[in-house]
């Protein structure tokens, strides 16, 4: 239990003890305490006096006074109590309890903020999963940044997380990729008789694959059409995936599993789920096609599994894939989908229900669109290539840190304008610069302290920390673990980014209000330890969203 929860629990226990002591109730109702909207009204407040009115048959202000008179303020860490309005009790805490967070942060280091106890739940988090048919773009970048941050947050909160990328290496898009490579392969050999498929890929990278294969493997031209296309499928996917993996690694995004769609066919899992759904009575034949009764499970219409030409829809392998996730022992399945996949939510959930799997175990987050902005105008095409702007170009333009930070600043279900000019600014208007500068500033102060012979130690007299800005800063440090737990519970990576901004702001305010290094050696030691706790917290929080914490800027 974190220090904030400990103090809240102690306060509730002491309020209950006070009610007993005052003889106000034989059975005490739930005591709810909350943080007042206005900090002038204390650190915590409760309406328990009004709740007890009918039980105690007394005026709520009288009840409130009886609670105040019988409260052990020392145990409750309370220095002042006010009774407000009809009977609200406002508590002002003796904030010295907050200084306990300093040695805790220093001792735990890069594990500070992490929940020690495992929640005992396995989470499979699938994100990015872009088709291996071209470069990653800004939508994939948001998916990667949010997905990787969410994996870090869930891990810190005690979940067992597996990060997975689903490789769409089967189906029509890969056939079109192979046909496109075939066209460019023969063009490079001087044969223009192979036309591009209607939905073919004509990007520069696909042209380069064709040329490269013509140069290195001209013998492919003599293969049968079936063997040739099989080779182009394999080599095309390998080439594209190698490029995607390289870009994602540079974007500080890593995966535990790369799951191939083709493996579902090879292992017979698609036929297995199809047979199982038929056996359970959830499929039927109509118009020459095979359908799944997803309307039995709140979908708006039934879905086709096998088309009337005998080919599978995309839905069937997706069902097999998600059932495979369940079979692997995962308790929670989280998918991050692009905005164009919104209609997939109900049908996927319905498909799990056909197997008796609680569809609430599947959580789908929809990533809304990102617009790249420059000088107030949307930038749709690359100035260099004339094509859609790629993840690599974004990394080259603004850097990995800025891209990761900006893409996790907003809830993924909201549209986001990515201001590339702001992301490059070295000013406090740039959110990532503002946060990283706070870390670098602390490192500079710690270096000065060391030069003066003052080492960071968790064993200090922290009673010298009385400045209001210092107390507010410590409150923010103490709020790190609750923020992680909240971000994990709500699957909200942007809560960490918001926290980083607040923590950096509180540090800058403290820095501007009070000198860290003073002639008072005991106070200086306490302040040095405190800002080390802040530095650790900042670094850990930045790491959660995949951003570095530089020691100098």
From Swiss-Prot:
A motif ('HIGH' region) lies at residues 130-140. Pfam families: Arg_tRNA_synt_N (PF03485), DALR_1 (PF05746), tRNA-synt_1d (PF00750). It is found in: Cytoplasm. It catalyses: tRNA(Arg) + L-arginine + ATP = L-arginyl-tRNA(Arg) + AMP + diphosphate. It is an enzyme of class 6 (ligase). Its EC number is 6.1.1.19. Its main location: cytoplasm. Transmembrane segments: none annotated. GO terms for biological process: arginyl-tRNA aminoacylation. Disulfide bonds: none annotated. GO terms for cellular component: cytoplasm. InterPro entries: aa-tRNA-synth_I_CS, Arg-tRNA-ligase, Arg-tRNA-synth_N, Arg-tRNA-synth_N_sf, ArgRS_core, DALR_anticod-bd, Rossmann-like_a/b/a_fold, tRNAsynth_Ia_anticodon-bd. GO terms for molecular function: arginine-tRNA ligase activity; ATP binding. Keywords: Aminoacyl-tRNA synthetase, ATP-binding, Cytoplasm, Ligase, Nucleotide-binding, Protein biosynthesis. Belongs to the class-I aminoacyl-tRNA synthetase family. PANTHER family: ARGININE--TRNA LIGASE, CYTOPLASMIC, ARGINYL-TRNA SYNTHETASE. Monomer. HAMAP family: Arg_tRNA_synth. This is Arginine--tRNA ligase. It comes from Staphylococcus aureus (strain Mu3 / ATCC 700698).
């Amino acid at each position: 239990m974190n220090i904030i929860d400990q103090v809240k629990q102690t306060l509730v226990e002491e309020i209950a003890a006070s009610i007993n002591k005052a003889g106000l109730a034989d059975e005490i109702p739930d005591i709810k305490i909350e943080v007042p909207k206005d900090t002038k009204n204390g650190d915590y407040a409760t309406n328990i006096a009004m709740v007890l009115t009918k039980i105690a048959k007394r005026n709520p202000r009288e009840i409130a006074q009886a609670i105040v008179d019988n409260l052990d303020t020392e145990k409750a860490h309370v220095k002042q109590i006010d009774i407000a309005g009809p009977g609200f009790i406002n508590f002002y805490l003796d904030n010295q309890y907050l200084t306990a967070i300093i040695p805790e942060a220093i001792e735990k280091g890069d594990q500070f903020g992490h929940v020690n106890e495992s929640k005992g739940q396995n989470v499979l988090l699938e994100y990015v999963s872009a088709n291996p048919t071209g470069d990653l773009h800004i939508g994939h970048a948001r998916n990667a940044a949010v997905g990787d941050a969410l994996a870090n947050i869930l891990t810190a909160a005690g979940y067992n997380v597996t990060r997975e990328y689903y490789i769409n290496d089967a189906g029509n898009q890969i056939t079109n990729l192979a046909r496109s490579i075939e066209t460019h392969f023969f063009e490079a050999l001087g044969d223009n008789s192979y036309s591009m498929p209607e939905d073919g890929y004509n990007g520069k990278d696909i042209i380069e694959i064709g040329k490269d294969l013509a140069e290195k493997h001209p013998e492919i031209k003599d293969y049968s059409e079936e063997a040739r296309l099989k080779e182009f499928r394999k080599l095309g996917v390998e080439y594209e995936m190698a490029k995607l993996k390289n870009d994602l690694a540079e974007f500080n995004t890593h995966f535990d599993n790369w799951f191939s769609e083709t493996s579902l066919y090879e292992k017979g899992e698609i036929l297995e789920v199809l047979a199982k759904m038929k056996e359970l009575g959830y499929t039927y034949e109509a118009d020459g096609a095979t359908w799944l009764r997803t309307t039995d499970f709140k979908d708006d219409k039934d879905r086709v599994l096998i088309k009337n030409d005998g080919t599978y829809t995309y839905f069937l392998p997706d069902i097999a894939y998600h059932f495979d996730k369940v079979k692997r022992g995962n308790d929670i399945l989280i998918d991050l989908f692009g905005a164009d996949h919104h209609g997939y939510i109900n049908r996927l959930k319905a498909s799990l229900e056909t197997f008796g799997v609680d569809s609430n175990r599947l959580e789908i987050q929809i990533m809304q669109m990102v617009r790249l902005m420059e000088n107030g105008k949307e930038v749709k095409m690359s100035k260099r290539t004339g094509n859609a702007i790629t993840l690599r170009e974004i990394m080259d333009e603004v850097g990995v840190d800025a891209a990761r930070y900006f893409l996790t600043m907003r809830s993924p279900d909201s549209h986001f304008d990515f201001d590339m000019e702001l992301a490059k600014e070295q000013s406090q208007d740039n959110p990532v610069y503002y946060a990283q500068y706070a870390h670098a500033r602390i490192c500079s102060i710690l270096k000065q302290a060391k030069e003066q012979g003052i080492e960071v130690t968790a064993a200090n007299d922290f009673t010298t920390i009385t400045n209001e800005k210092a107390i507010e800063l410590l409150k923010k440090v103490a709020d790190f673990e609750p923020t992680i737990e909240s971000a994990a519970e709500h699957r909200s990576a942007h809560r960490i980014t918001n926290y980083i901004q607040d923590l950096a702001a509180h540090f800058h305010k403290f820095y501007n209000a009070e000198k860290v290094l003073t002639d008072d050696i005991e106070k200086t030691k306490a302040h040095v330890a405190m800002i080390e706790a802040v530095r650790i917290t900042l670094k850990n929080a930045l790491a959660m969203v995949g951003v570095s914490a530089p020691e100098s800027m």
